[in-house]
Amino acid sequence: MSDTGHDRIIHDHVITEPELLEEALAETADGAAARDIAEVPAVEIINTVAVHLLSAAAVKCGLADDPEQQTDLDEARKLINAMAGLVTASAADLGDHHARALRDGLRSVQLAFREASPFPDAPGEGAGEKWTGAVN
């Protein structure tokens, strides 16, 4: 990897030049035209990131097809913490409709985390609870 600060991994390839990165991003999604990030509303970006965090956290909590191989509670805690911080910080900007759905999903993975944990955290100390308060 170069130390330009512009390195990115796309489809398992390290892209080191900004121009090549732009080309690679434009060619993703089976040749479909990449959407100009400047055209995407912030609420849509926040929702997309939150859904990715939520999905990854669910898998790491053992809620996917192969829980024996995919469960990783340390990783789940990190993802849930990130989602809790994002949702809490952006709730006012998202509006009630979007924020409520994200909070419901967040609560679900927080409860799944508690259930999967062999050593339950104290109330208020669980994954993401620093930002959401105790979940039960």
Predicted features and spans:
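A charge-rich, low-complexity, intrinsically flexible signal that marks solvent-exposed coils, linkers
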Residues: 2-136
